[in-house]
Design a protein with these regions (language model features):
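Predominantly cytoplasmic-facing regulatory/coupling regions of multi-pass membrane proteins
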Residues: 1-42, 98-202, 221-268
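Short gly/ser-rich anion-binding loops that grip negatively charged ligand groups
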Residues: 14, 28, 32, 36, ...
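Transmembrane helix boundary and interhelical junction motifs in multipass membrane proteins
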Residues: 15-20, 50-60, 188-189, 198-215
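Helix-terminus/helix-capping segments at the ends of transmembrane helices and short amphipathic helices
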Residues: 25, 63-64, 178, 216
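Membrane-interface alpha-helices at helix entry/exit sites of multi-pass transporters
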Residues: 34-37, 56-57, 68-83, 222-232
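Membrane-embedded alpha-helical segments of transport systems
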Residues: 43-51, 73-97, 231-243
Length: 268
């Protein structure tokens, strides 16, 4: 059934999302066990209902207090994850456009240009943080850029690879889920559409406006089914992830605020 499809997918996304956080923190901040990342990554989904960046801020605070990682440095790791997430979404959106660009609204024709521009920005970005470009600049030495100074070029690609199973599994899940709403679509067709929708919805501007309603545009004649599909898929994913967070909330609070109280007591 639909729930039997969505529940395992949500857990898989949570585990992959936690893996990315664990990998980045261990690269740039401190040695942390994967199982110790799960409580804060899960709990942060509750705050992400309001705003994704608030959730990342909570993770930064947790790692700062629990592992003693300097605030600016762990904040830098959160920025690194956000930076890689943009390139991850853009990479797969480019694949999607290559597969189904002819059937997409004209607003998405900008994706190849965005991809080329982003590639050039990445090259300049890497040259700057390696000290090749503007070698006398002190901007790169600021704590907020700690992760970017430490990063190797392959780290960026590794994060994209680690995240990709989440998107590929989403393609299959959405393909099957759509059939429950009476609409049949192939996996390759969904691979063309879904990354575009994810990228567009995460990007401010005209693409976001169109992406939110793209299901209806892509499947004319099924307006009611597609409106329901987009609404149900999006909201189930957000709220079930928050429910996962509730499982870990007590432990996260205990490790975060309990440790803070112990520190206050020792200072007194």
């Amino acid at each position: 059934s639909w729930l039997a499809l969505m529940v395992p997918y949500s857990f898989l996304f949570f585990l992959i999302d936690s893996l990315v956080l664990w990998r980045v923190v261990n690269w740039y901040n401190a040695e942390v066990r994967y199982v110790d990342i799960l409580p804060i990554r899960g709990s942060s989904y509750i705050l992400s209902i309001l705003n994704e960046q608030v959730g990342k801020g909570a993770m930064a605070l947790y790692l700062n207090r629990r592992n003693g990682v300097p605030g600016w440095e762990v904040g830098s790791s959160m920025l690194f994850i956000m930076f890689c997430e943009f390139y991850y979404l853009l990479t797969w959106a480019s694949v999607g456009y290559a597969l189904q660009g002819d059937s997409l609204p004209d607003v998405f024709s900008v994706i190849p240009k965005v991809a080329v521009g982003a590639a050039l920005v990445f090259i300049v970005f890497r040259l700057f943080f390696r000290g090749t470009l503007f070698p006398n600049s002190t901007v790169r030495d600021k704590p907020v850029f700690h992760a970017f100074r430490q990063a190797r070029t392959w780290h960026f690609g590794m994060i994209i690879l680690l995240r990709s199973p989440a998107l590929l599994s989403a393609v299959w899940v959405y393909t099957v889920a759509l059939s429950y709403f009476g609409v049949e679509v192939g996996n390759m067709q969904m691979l063309g559409y879904l990354p575009i929708i994810f990228f567009g919805a995460a990007t401010p501007g005209p693409m976001r406006t169109v992406a939110i309603t793209l299901w209806v545009v892509l499947f004319p004649g099924y307006e009611g089914q597609m409106t329901a599909f987009g609404f149900v898929q999006h909201n189930f994913f957000i709220f079930f992830n928050a429910a996962i967070g509730l499982v870990f909330l007590n432990r996260a609070n205990r490790e975060l605020f309990g440790q803070s109280e112990q520190q206050s007591g020792s200072e007194a």
